[in-house]
Structures are given as structure tokens and as C-alpha cells.
From Swiss-Prot:
Key words, A-Z: Membrane, Signal-anchor, Transmembrane, Transmembrane helix
UniProt topology in membrane: Single-pass type II membrane protein
Name this polypeptide is given: Protein trichome birefringence-like 15
Organism taxonomic ancestry: Eukaryota, Viridiplantae, Streptophyta, Embryophyta, Tracheophyta
Miscellaneous note of the record: Contains 2 motifs that are conserved in esterases, but it is unlikely that this protein belongs to the catalytically active pectin esterases.
Main localization category: membrane
Similarity-based family: Belongs to the PC-esterase family. TBL subfamily.
Transmembrane segments: 109-129
Motif range (GDS motif): 217-219
GO biological process assignments: xylan biosynthetic process
InterPro entries recorded: TBL_C (IPR026057), TBL_N (IPR025846)
């Protein structure tokens, strides 16, 4: 039973009988208006990456799982006029049965159905009008977070590179490592057609209450993890944050310089943020051999054991790989490629790029099959972070400031892998490519004696980024999609 009611702030709503019912309920008609820009700063809405659907955050006055389509514009195609119908359409997905007095309700209220019928008739007339050679379409204003421009922002950086020593590796902290210029810190990413919400660490932790965020990948993923820790703590010393690495087996192995990852928990909100090192995102298993070099089976078609073992504990999973897929690195790590449990050499997998493509597609396919079993989990695959051939430039945006156009991601491998799946893309490649001045190149190598810091040589790393810096923007894009 479905009743349609006008969209009023105080409209009384009660729970529905939840037996897998999918109901589309028109809850109101606003006055005609032009298409508006999506604005992620609306405090009452949480808009996903395409700025089309927003989940209301009202508590008592709205049915759970209600999704609102903010607005859309129906065009007539004689190019003389446009009719704008601004509708609010509630989408209620019901899963559990609750009965009240032996009756089931979705919404309680009343409205004249003639108004709804009139709208449908007008729409039908527009579509079926005579002498209209073109097909009627619905034009929707979308928001592509990967398109936009870098703009100056006096509120940047989000934290201090000096004060966030608790979470930052020295090599990523360019202020600690003696970089002389920091103009690159004063910019934020402005998407085309919508706004990224201004980061607020208190609100972020509240939204992530009782949740676990996992970054799994290579050193770029570790940078993003360290960036988020600095953002969530405001870059301050935070002794109350707990080291819970042992819960995930993240302890320092005997003879190793560091653990395979880190896990920290904010006790006030029970929010856990962790990082796990898996440069290839493959399952690495020592082979049965005793003579050096100790070979490691690199199972291209199996996700890392860490993901398989702890996936059920994650609420947000962020994956990345790319820069360790070279013949040189594979041989230095003594990795031996396997597929279906069998060693593969030559043929298709002789080309390392083919092996990378196969691995990414295999992992995304596996993860997509797992997501229905973990409905609370949101999974993202980060596109590759660009390596610049030269990065001795210190002038921000000398390569330009805008990314425009209708094209897709520069990382076509990740884009094609996630296409049509439940795994979302975190597209950071193009916007990062504009920021060659923000790498850690130009920092000083750590001197043997503190007195020699000024004479220490610099190093030329055009892959990793200074923090604060570009990975902070990656996290803002991630949070906007959550």
C-alpha cells in the first residue's frame, strides 16, 4: 500500500512493512526552476560522486534508506523553450518487515492524484509531440570530481608538516627534510560543477564512527594513509590514539626494519585507520626452497591474504598499485608469477604490463563478487599517481591549472577494470599530473651529523609527494564520495 503525500518538512512518516518492497514515491513537486549546481556543502545532504543522488540526514522525519534526486530538467526539442520540472523522488528500499496494528504503511498523508497525473500527461505530451524528429531525453547536471581546477586557498595547508611528526615519515615531510619553498601548499582542488565539502576532522570522525578505513597498496597508498592520519588529528600529537596493529597481525617481524603496516584507532569514535603494504596487490607466498635466493610465488589471480582475512572488518577499502610492476622490481623481489597455482613464464605474462592488467582485473572481479556479502563496505581503486620525468620546477601550476573535457581517466587500466562493477574509481591521475612542483625532490638527504644538514645533498624523487600536499586532496575526493 502506497500513499503519496506533499513534501512538507513536518510530514508524518512511519515505518513500512519491509519485505523486499521497492517503492518509488513522489513526495512533492517544487515550483519550476532551472537546473542548479550541485553543492556538497548542503548540511542536510550527503551527495555521492556524481552529484545526482543524495541521502537525507534527517533522523526522525524521514524513512530510512530514503534517497532523493535533487532536480532534473526535461527539455522540449524544438529548441524554442525548456520546461523545468523540479521533482523530489523518494526511493525506499525495504528489507525487513515491521507491522503496526496489522497494517503496513510507507507514508501517511494525502494529496490530489490529479496533480501527479497532470504532470505525467504533460511529460507524455512533450515526448510524443508531433513533428519532433529528435528523441526526448532527460538532461542531468553531473559532477565529475576528476574534472576541475586548482585554485589558491589561504586556508591551506590543512595541517603542519612540522607538527605531524607522529604520523609522517621524515622522507615525506618536506619541511623536516629542508625543502626551501612551500608555495605548493596553498592550493585546493575545485571540481567542475560542484564543491568538495571543507574538511572538518570532528565531523569526519563522527561520520566514521565505529568504522575501519583500510589503505592497501604501495608507498603512494602509505602516503595517503599518513595524510589522513594528519588530517584527522589536525597534525597534532595525539597520545590518545591507540596503536591496534596487533589486531591485524601488523607487528615488526624479527629482523625487519618496520611492520607490514600500521593500524590506529581514535577511541572517542572507535574509528580505525590502517595501512598494509602490498605493492603488487597479489598473494605472495614463499616457495618451498631452502637455497637462496628464496623465491616467492606471486599469485596474480589471488588477492593478498591480508585482504581475504580482514575484509569483513573493513567499511572503506582503498586499493592502489602500479609502480612496482617492472621486470627489474619483480626480479629484485624474487617474485615468480603464478596463475591457477601454476608457474607462468613467457607468453602473455612475459610482458609485465599484461601481468599488471590481469592482476587488477582479477582483483576487482573478486572484490565485486564479495561486496554483496559485505553490504556496509565501500571499495575504491585509486588510479596511478604520475611519475614526472623532471620535477625541479618550484613554480605552482606551470603545467596549467585545469582538467576539462568529456574524456575518462588517464589510467585506462583501472577505469576499465571497475567499469560495470560495485568498485568505485578514485581518479587522481590527471589532477596530480599538473603538480610536478609538489614532489619531494629538492629535499635534503638525511645527514650523518646534524651539523652537516645544510651541506647534505638533495635527492631527485619525482614520484612521491610532500606532505602536506597532493595526497591530502586525494583524501578529500575520497571523503566526498563516502
Amino acid at each position: 500500500m502506497v500513499q503519496i503525500v506533499p513534501h512538507v518538512a513536518n510530514a508524518h512518516m512511519v515505518k513500512t512493512s519491509r519485505k523486499g518492497l521497492l517503492a518509488l514515491v513522489v513526495v512533492g513537486v517544487e515550483e519550476c526552476c532551472p537546473t542548479r549546481r550541485c553543492d556538497l556543502r548542503d548540511p542536510n545532504l550527503v551527495v555521492d560522486s556524481n552529484c545526482l543522488l543524495s541521502r537525507s540526514t534527517h533522523q526522525s522525519s524521514l524513512v530510512e534508506d530514503s534517497i532523493i534526486i535533487n532536480h532534473f530538467r526535461i527539455l522540449n526539442f524544438n529548441n524554442r523553450a525548456s520546461i523545468f520540472l523540479c521533482l523530489r523522488i523518494g526511493v525506499i528500499c525495504s528489507t525487513q518487515s515491521k507491522m503496526y496494528g496489522g497494517k503496513s504503511y510507507i507514508l501517511k498523508g494525502s494529496v490530489s492524484l490529479s496533480l501527479i497525473i497532470l504532470i505525467l500527461l504533460v511529460t507524455t505530451l512533450l515526448v510524443s509531440a508531433k513533428n519532433q524528429p529528435r528523441i526526448s531525453l532527460i538532461e542531468v547536471k553531473t559532477c565529475n570530481l576528476a574534472k576541475g581546477e586548482w585554485v589558491e586557498d589561504k586556508k591551506r595547508p590543512l595541517y603542519s608538516g612540522f607538527e605531524c611528526k607522529q604520523w609522517l615519515s621524515n622522507i615525506f615531510s618536506c619541511r623536516v627534510m629542508g625543502r626551501p619553498d612551500f608555495s605548493f601548499e596553498g592550493y585546493r582542488w575545485q571540481p567542475e560543477g560542484c564543491n568538495i565539502p571543507e574538511f572538518n576532522r570532528v565531523n569526519f570522525l563522527r561520520r566514521m564512527q565505529n568504522k575501519t578505513i583500510a589503505f592497501i597498496g604501495d608507498s603512494l597508498g602509505r602516503e595517503q594513509f599518513q595524510s589522513l592520519m594528519c588530517m584527522a588529528t589536525g597534525g597534532k600529537e595525539s597520545p590518545e590514539v591507540q596503536n591496534v596493529g596487533s589486531e591485524y597481525g601488523l607487528v615488526i617481524p624479527k629482523g625487519a626494519p618496520r611492520p607490514g603496516g600500521w593500524a590506529y584507532r581514535f577511541p572517542t569514535t572507535n574509528t580505525t585507520v590502517l595501512s598494509y603494504w602490498s605493492a603488487s596487490l597479489t598473494d605472495l607466498v614463499p616457495m618451498n626452497n631452502t637455497d637462496p635466493p628464496h623465491l616467492i610465488a606471486m599469485h596474480l589471480d589471488r588477492p593478498p591474504a591480508f585482504i581475504r582475512n580482514y575484509l569483513h572488518r573493513f567499511h572503506v577499502l582503498v586499493l592502489n598499485t602500479g609502480h612496482h610492476w617492472s621486470r627489474d622490481k619483480i626480479e629484485k623481489n624474487h617474485w615468480v608469477m603464478h596463475v591457477n597455482g601454476t608457474r607462468v613464464e613467457g607468453g602473455y605474462f612475459k610482458n609485465v604490463e599484461n601481468a599488471k592488467i590481469f592482476t587488477i582485473h582479477s582483483l576487482v572481479k573478486w572484490l565485486d563478487a564479495q561486496l554483496p556479502l559485505h553490504p556496509r563496505l565501500k571499495a575504491f581503486f585509486t588510479t596511478i599517481s604520475p611519475r614526472h620525468e623532471k620535477c625541479n620546477n618550484t613554480i605552482p601550476l606551470s603545467r596549467g591549472s585545469k582538467i576539462t573535457g568529456e574524456g575518462g581517466s588517464l589510467d585506462t587500466i583501472v577505469e576499465s577494470a571497475v567499469n560495470g562493477t560495485r568498485v568505485k574509481i578514485l581518479d587522481i591521475t590527471a589532477l596530480s599530473k599538473l603538480r610536478d612542483e609538489a614532489h619531494i625532490a629538492g629535499c635534503k638527504l638525511k645527514p650523518k651529523k646534524a651539523s652537516n644538514v645544510t651541506s647534505a645533498p638533495t635527492f631527485n624523487d619525482c614520484l612521491h609527494w610532500c606532505l602536506p600536499g597532493i595526497p591530502d586532496t586525494w583524501n578529500e575526493l575520497l571523503i566526498a564520495q563516502l
